[in-house]
């Protein structure tokens, strides 16, 4: 942010781990005023996710337990990535080369194979090991200091839409839009995603102009 916009707050758009990492900035008090808005797709705040699980297990209901069970099944790969050595070998010995085929079979998306896919996937495993369990078991209280838009693919194989249904306690200015799309929505529905981002950014900027006009900004 300091490099691309040192004097003006920025609009952040992120997906998957980019979104998970961006939540850190959007909920970090030291970053307040640097981020104008945040559009998140298929990448929840890990602290919010930890509280989501905790709340449903502490005050169990049939619906809540079903949501926990469904998300636990969707998160199968997270458990795999906690194992030593094995997931890294899977990426380097075959998963990297098979990635385009997997996306085509699971999501109907055509992507080209690229150099570095295997090493990127192997390094990505470290993100899960370093961040997932500490935040899920010991979640912090993290409130967003910027308007947040959630783009929710209802056919996401890894992130349940239910994970984003209780975020009003963490986000004061929240917009949530569901799409009939899979996890890789930026690849499968780029126009719809771009349109949602444009509309949200314009809305936030209009609200900012109105607040400044009233002497509130």
Where is each model-derived feature located?
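Flexible "cap/lid" subdomain of the alpha/beta-hydrolase fold that forms the substrate-access gate
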Residues: 1-13, 20-174
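Short active-site segment of divalent metal-dependent hydrolases/proteases
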Residues: 18-19, 186
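Catalytic active-site module of serine/aspartate enzymes centered on a nucleophile-bearing elbow/loop
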Residues: 172-217
């Amino acid at each position: 942010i300091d490099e691309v916009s040192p004097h003006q707050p920025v609009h952040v758009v992120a997906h998957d781990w980019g979104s998970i990492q961006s939540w850190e900035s959007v909920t970090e008090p030291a970053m307040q005023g640097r981020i104008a808005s945040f559009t998140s797709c298929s990448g929840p705040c890990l602290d919010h996710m930890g509280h989501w699980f905790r709340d449903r297990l502490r005050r169990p209901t049939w619906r809540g337990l079903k949501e926990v069970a469904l998300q636990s099944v969707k998160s199968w790969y997270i458990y795999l990535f906690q194992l030593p050595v094995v997931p890294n070998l899977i990426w380097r010995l075959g998963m990297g080369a098979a990635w385009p085929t997997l996306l085509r079979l699971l999501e109907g998306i055509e992507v080209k194979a690229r150099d570095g896919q295997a090493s990127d996937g192997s390094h990505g495993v470290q993100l899960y090991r370093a961040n997932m369990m500490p935040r899920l078991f010991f979640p912090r209280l993290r409130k967003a200091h910027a308007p947040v838009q959630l783009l929710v693919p209802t056919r996401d194989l890894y992130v349940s839409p239910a994970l984003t249904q209780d975020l009003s306690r963490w986000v004061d200015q929240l917009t949530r839009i569901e799409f009939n799309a899979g996890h890789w929505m930026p690849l499968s529905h780029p126009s719809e995603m771009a349109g949602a981002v444009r509309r949200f950014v314009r809305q936030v900027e209009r609200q900012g102009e109105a607040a400044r006009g009233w002497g509130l900004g």
